[in-house]
């Protein structure tokens, strides 16, 4: 972690751990993931007609809404480099609002090579699957967002909020073993399932 004023502010928002449990380590998003920019309508043939995930497909509970995906013609050569893979994290890099900062992140769990993602988003793709689980990283970033840390990572121009990528990609990530990650993910999802059951019964 780079110790500067920005990092200190982020540490206050997401929690600064002076000593991690045995077996944990700390790295950053940019070391863990490739970051890939999105695309939009193509200008040079050949084209391919594909569905493109947009900010509008992000639900309030940070899931992917497939009901209104927009299909457009994109350049085939660009799509070959920017199609979604199962386990990708789609990050809103432009958009947001005063009440909802930019930086919302959803986990793509669909078929690989079918959809792409818009130029208002980007993808985090884990470099080494034996390092971190995509679901663990998804819940990790979600927790950071819910704590309000993304407000320190955005600029605003004419009502549009933009993610400061260098700051976002410098987020420290605390990583346990894969087995511990799986235990944490299972526990989180068990709690969410219980909450859903309670809400449905009201």
Named regions from a protein language model:
Residues 1-7:
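Extended, domain-scale alpha-helical bundle/helix-rich regions
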Residues 125-133:
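Ligand-binding loop in jelly-roll beta-barrel domains
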């Amino acid at each position: 972690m780079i110790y500067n004023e920005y990092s200190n502010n982020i540490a206050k928002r997401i929690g600064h751990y002076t000593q991690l449990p045995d077996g944990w380590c700390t790295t950053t998003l940019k070391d863990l993931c490739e970051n890939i920019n999105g695309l939009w309508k193509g200008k040079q043939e050949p084209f391919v007609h594909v569905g493109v995930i947009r900010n509008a497909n992000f639900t309030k509970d940070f899931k992917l809404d497939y009901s209104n995906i927009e299909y457009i013609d994109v350049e085939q050569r660009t799509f070959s480099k920017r199609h979604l893979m199962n386990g990708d994290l789609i990050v809103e890099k432009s958009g947001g609002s005063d009440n909802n900062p930019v930086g919302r992140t959803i986990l793509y769990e669909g078929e690989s090579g079918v959809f792409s993602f818009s130029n208002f988003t980007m993808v985090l793709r884990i470099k080494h699957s034996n390092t971190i689980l995509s679901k663990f990283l998804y819940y990790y970033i979600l927790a950071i967002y819910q704590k309000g840390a993304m407000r320190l990572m955005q600029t605003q121009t004419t009502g549009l909020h933009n993610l400061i990528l260098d700051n976002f990609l410098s987020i420290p990530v605390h990583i346990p073993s894969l087995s511990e990650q799986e235990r944490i993910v299972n526990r989180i999802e068990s709690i969410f399932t219980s909450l859903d059951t309670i809400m449905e019964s009201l």
